[in-house]
Amino acid sequence: MEIFHSIQGEGFHSGTPHVFVRFGNCNLRCDWCDTDFLTFDEQSIDSIVDQVISYDCDRVIFTGGEPAMQDLSPIGKRLKHHGISLSIETNGTMPIDPVIDWICVSPKDQLYPNVSIKQRLGDELKVVYCGQDMSMYDDLKEGFTHHFIQPCYIDSDTVEQNGKSFQIVEKIVKESPGWRLSLQMHKWMGIL
């Protein structure tokens, strides 16, 4: 696990400061994931809470890896006691603890056809576009208030390869007004 204070670079809360609590475990492995799965240490709930409140920020994002693999209730209740709003970025393959205030599901079923999305309700649906048919999300969209599409950006790809993904996403957003563009601003800014 790692804990750090930064600017949310994706989706609805893009541009706002948050404390990120990033867990290392995940039930999937996506090429574009920006999580380093090798450098995580386990921490006590007290240690996590102390680190989070030291940043004097009232917003936390549980991310990963897959944060829903953790029991977030004890940590979440303690943080809420300090007036902190809790968000989660999840692949949606596991139900989310009710202690969470904001649910962002970023489904990966375009890469893992045998994986089913269990968390079908939430605040934000954020799809990473990898060439899939966007109609596969028509039913899922109904359970979410905000719908974002994000071009797949792979650090090892060429500018041309990543640029092609950006152009396709631009076209999708123009032709499908129910989708809004999400870019990974933190990568452009060179921050976590």
What does each of the following model-derived ranges do?
Residues 3, 7-10, 44, 56, ...:
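Residue-level signal for well-ordered alpha-helical segments
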Residues 1-3, 17-23, 29-101:
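Conserved Radical SAM active-site core
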